[in-house]
Regions:
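N-terminal amphipathic/basic-hydrophobic helices that include classical n-h-c signal peptides
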Residues: 1-28
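N-terminal beta1-alpha1-beta2 submodule of the flavodoxin-like/Rossmannoid cofactor-binding fold
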Residues: 22-130, 192-226
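Gly/Ser/Thr-rich helix-start
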Residues: 42, 100, 104, 110, ...
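Mobile beta-alpha loop/short-helix "lid" or hinge segments that flank ligand
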Residues: 67-72, 164-196
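Alpha-helix boundary/capping detector
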Residues: 120-123, 127, 144, 162, ...
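Short, glycine-/small-residue-rich phosphate/pyrophosphate-handling segment
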Residues: 132-182
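Glycine-rich phosphate-binding loop at the start of an alpha helix
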Residues: 154, 186, 203
Length: 226
């Protein structure tokens, strides 16, 4: 028996719920949304590397967005507009995307509150099934090697599963995953920052972040063209 999300995905494929596509001189592009939260820059640098991987896939284009910080006094965003960097993500960004990659530093083994707050506001997309049948991946950064990378990546996967998305990880056929002595997991890309406040990804961490972007984008292109 077809589930609710199967029905919604079928409607999207049939044209009953048309997706808006990005038009370029080369034609229509498959859009992959990369959403992250970062305080000191490590997760932001991972996000940029994920975007590089996405943009290397023919027919795919990356769209980089961040989330607003959350104040201690209330659960609302601290500022309506970021002072620098990518714009804040909107629900419309999420609805239009053909794929999604989420990133957050760890907070005691979980995703950071600003990203969790944004995901908690996506109920309307869950009701409509707007994300069902789309590929997604996750990435994180920690200060120490055993600082909670895997559990943080898993915490970001849970809302994506509720939305009916296809999770994409990193296989051990990626050479960097076997050779890394820092970040990098089968669950997603990661970075170990150490005590430095300056983001400095290793070659393996950079390669795996790009590989994650390529894998999500390649699957999204296939699904869109199916």
């Amino acid at each position: 028996m077809a589930t609710y999300f199967d029905t919604q995905a079928a409607r999207a494929r049939s044209g009953a719920m048309p997706r808006l596509r990005i038009a370029t001189w080369e034609g229509f592009m498959t859009e992959i949304l990369v959403v992250y939260y970062s305080r000191k820059g490590s997760t932001a640098e991972l996000a940029r590397q994920v975007c590089r991987g996405i943009d290397s896939v023919p027919g795919a284009v990356a769209k980089l967005r961040t989330v607003a910080p959350v104040t201690a006094e209330s659960e609302g965003p601290a500022k309506p507009v970021p002072s620098s960097g990518p714009p804040y993500v909107t629900l419309e960004d999420l609805r239009r995307a053909d794929g999604l990659v989420l990133g957050s530093p760890t907070r005691f083994g979980n995703m950071a509150a600003p990203l969790k707050y944004f995901l908690d506001c996506t109920s309307s997309l869950w009701v409509s099934g707007a994300l069902a049948g789309k590929p997604a991946g996750v990435f994180t950064s920690t200060q120490t090697l055993h600082g909670g990378q895997e559990s943080t990546l898993l915490s970001m996967m849970l809302p994506l599963l509720h939305h009916g998305m296809y999770l994409v990880g990193l296989p051990y056929t990626e050479r960097a995953l076997n050779e890394t002595r820092g970040g990098g997991t089968p669950y997603g890309a990661s970075h170990v920052s150490g005590p430095s406040d300056e983001p400095s990804l290793s070659d393996h961490e950079r390669a795996l972040a790009q590989a994650l972007g390529r894998r999500v984008a390649a699957l999204a292109v296939r699904l869109v063209e199916a």
